[in-house]
Swiss-Prot record:
Transcription factor required for protein utilization and degradation. Regulates transcription of major secreted proteases. It comes from Emericella nidulans (strain FGSC A4 / ATCC 38163 / CBS 112.46 / NRRL 194 / M139) (Aspergillus nidulans). Residues 38-67 bind DNA. SUPFAM superfamilies: Zn2/Cys6 DNA-binding domain. This is Transcriptional activator of proteases prtT. Residues 1-28, 112-163 are annotated as: Disordered.
Length: 660
């Protein structure tokens, strides 16, 4: 009687050998059967034999039927071998492609990159933010076009939502992303500058020469950049640094510089086209940097035809980057948030330059950062430019509140009850000057080493004061006409006269203060708005309202406007600079003013001296020398919060719409 292997102790020895060869923690590998019996032999349960060189077994050959082998295990082994061969070839192709890219970019060989052995490390399918989320403007995911139309929604291969997250009530969209992990819903992060951007920008393509680009950058750095709050908008010291940080910022700086230098029209056209192209291409991308926001602000401050749209786009990107939260983080001790909070204040002013002046509601409201600007000024890293910047923040807070109180409806006249609130805003602006003008004296000393700026910081505060008073008090004439307006009340007349004197003070400062005269070409277009707005208002008031209504010397108005035109014609700037268009437009307005003056048989410049003893108002208006209705210059768009946006549009070079 044969003994079983168990009785003979063979089974125990075999198990010992298996345990010694295979560690306990590793599973026993599966044994794949090599049986190749065909279906016919399996059905008859007979031995399936193959002769050498034959593809059918002997049973199937004798029966004359097709020999079919149903060995799924063997099929799995064969298919697995094919898949591995293909995967190996694909990996080799990827390695070759990566090695080529590394050589092209001057980076170390692929073999120098090691994979960590930590089981908790990131897998190749789930790269971390720093290694898998760097995209330049030209190489971002949004720039890659799909093969066909349709929405492509992808999911992040990241961890599941953390139920222990300390932020119990996050933003709704953040909660949606936390659950779905859809990339399209993710809050944007700040992207690191791409190290190879220098070799890919428009200067490397030879759009303009590097020497000319260096000249333009140097001009911008010592002029416009210093005028705009002491250079806080451009933190880079050389062109190479700007190019590595943002091609958009480089294009913006060179475009603005070329606009301000005579005989650079061809360069301006090239840089402007590149800038517009880059802005368009980045409008739907998700990868942005602080320098991209600065680039949009540079364009908004000096490119009048794009200013409104660029400022709005800059604010939207800034909120995606979380700049509106930087102030709170800074006061909690995160000093690295200073630059981001500073940029948020700059965006507030930029937004209000092109909203309040045009009678549009601003995008940025008065949040804690805006209201507590004095706390920001106490930070140790604050520079003199911050004081200049926050002076405008404080002023626009007052004007914004006035805008919300009185609105921008050009057909809504102020009631007598409104003048009480108007006086409150006048007092607030007076207090603003008392607070910030002494501070600006310190800024003048700080800017003494800049031959281009000189005393502009302190004089600029006074200029903004006069313009704010003019803009606010000009509301007293809104929706009024000399043909159907009764006698002015004392409050309305007082407010209108303040508007007139403030507008004349604006023009006088530009003409008489040497440092403002010298800087007028390089200041942001909001200052040009002040000048144009004031001149246009005075010309139209001189025609619509005679001296019996208001304290206005039309001869002095004509002289002031004529001198402003001469100043703008003499500035050194490119042919497409805004001052050229303003000068041409005001010249046409002055011609119309003189034509109307002469048509009434009165020498030019003496409008205010006639009919001074008449009683103004109502049907008696025509008897006092008022122009007939078809010659009355429309006052809409020349006061308060209703400036006509076409006023600064270079495409409207003849300014005929100003004299409809």
């Amino acid at each position: 009687m044969k003994r079983s292997s168990f009785d003979a102790g063979l089974d125990g020895r075999q198990q010992d050998r298996r345990h010694s060869a295979v560690p306990d923690e590793r599973p026993t590998p599966l044994k794949i059967s090599k049986a190749r019996a065909c279906a016919e032999c399996k059905r008859h349960k007979i031995r399936c034999e193959f002769r050498p060189g034959e593809t059918s077994c002997t049973k199937c050959l004798r029966s004359g039927i097709k020999c079919v082998v149903n060995d799924f295990s063997q099929k799995f082994v064969d298919d697995d071998g094919v898949w591995k061969a293909r995967a190996s070839a694909t990996i080799q192709q990827l390695q070759a492609a990566v090695s080529h890219l590394l050589r092209q970019n001057g980076l170390p060989e692929l073999s120098t990159y090691t994979v960590g052995d930590s089981p908790n490390g990131p897998s190749p399918a789930a790269p971390s933010y720093h290694t898998g989320n760097r995209h330049s403007m030209n190489g971002s995911p949004s720039d890659v076009k799909p093969d066909g139309p349709g929405l492509v929604v992808t999911r992040e291969p990241s961890q599941e939502p953390d139920l222990q997250d300390r932020e119990l009530v996050p933003a709704p969209m953040r909660s949606l992303y936390e659950v779905t992990k859809l990339r399209d819903l993710r809050h944007n992060h700040i992207e690191q500058p791409k190290s190879t951007l220098l070799e890919e920008d428009f200067l490397s393509r030879g759009l303009i020469s590097l020497q000319e680009a260096e000249e333009l950058f140097a001009y911008f750095s010592r002029t416009m950049n210093q005028l705009l709050w002491g250079g806080i908008i451009l933190v880079h010291r050389d062109l190479t640094s700007v190019r590595r940080a943002s091609s958009l910022l480089a294009a913006a700086v060179l475009t603005v510089a070329a606009l301000h230098i005579p005989n650079r029209t061809e360069t301006l056209n090239l840089c402007y086209s590149e800038y517009v192209s880059l802005v368009s291409s980045m409008s739907l991308t998700r990868a942005h940097t602080l320098d991209d926001v600065r680039a949009l602000c540079v364009g908004a401050f000096w490119l009048s035809e794009l200013s409104w749209k660029l400022s709005g786009h800059a604010v939207r990107i800034a909120t995606e980057l979380g700049l509106h939260q930087s102030y709170q983080k800074m006061i909690r001790g995160h000093s690295d948030q200073y630059e981001r909070a500073q940029l948020w204040y700059l965006l507030y002013v930029c937004d209000h330059h092109f909203s309040i002046a045009y009678g549009r509601p601003p995008v940025i409201h008065e949040d804690q950062a805006i209201k507590n600007y004095e706390t920001f000024l106490q930070a140790p890293m604050v520079v003199p430019g911050d004081i200049r910047l926050l002076a405008q923040v404080a002023l626009f807070m007052i004007l914004t509140e006035a805008y919300r109180t009185f609105g921008s409806d050009t057909e809504q006249a102020l009631t007598e009850e409104d003048f009480g609130q108007l006086r409150v805003f006048n007092v607030a602006i007076d207090q603003w000057r008392l607070l910030w003008q002494p501070r600006s004296e310190y800024l003048t000393l700080a800017a003494a080493d800049s031959p281009y700026v000189r005393t502009y910081p302190s004089k600029g505060v006074v200029l903004h004061y006069h313009f704010a008073k003019f803009q606010l008090n000009s509301l007293s004439l809104r929706a009024l006409s000399p043909t159907n307006t009764p006698v002015f009340s004392m409050d309305r007349k007082e407010s209108a006269n303040i508007a007139i004197s403030s507008a004349m003070a604006c023009l006088n400062m530009v003409l008489e203060e040497q440092d403002i005269r010298d800087a007028i070409v390089g200041v942001p277009i909001f200052t040009h708005t002040m000048v144009t707005f004031s001149a246009l208002f005075l010309l139209k008031v001189a025609v619509n309202w005679n001296s019996a209504y208001l304290s206005l010397d039309s001869g002095l108005v004509r002289s002031l406007v004529e001198r402003v035109i001469e100043l703008l014609n003499c500035v050194s700037a490119g042919e497409r600079h805004l001052t050229r268009h303003i000068a041409r437009g005001l010249s046409k307005m002055l011609e119309r003013f003189d034509s109307w003056d002469m048509s009434n048989g009165v020498p030019a410049g003496t409008v205010g001296e006639r009919a001074g003893s008449g009683v103004p108002g109502g049907a008696n208006a025509m008897a006092q020398g008022f122009p007939p209705p078809d010659l009355i210059y429309d006052m809409v768009g020349t006061y308060g919060f209703g400036l006509d946006e076409n006023l600064l549009d270079p495409s409207m070079a003849n300014f005929e719409y100003l004299a409809q």
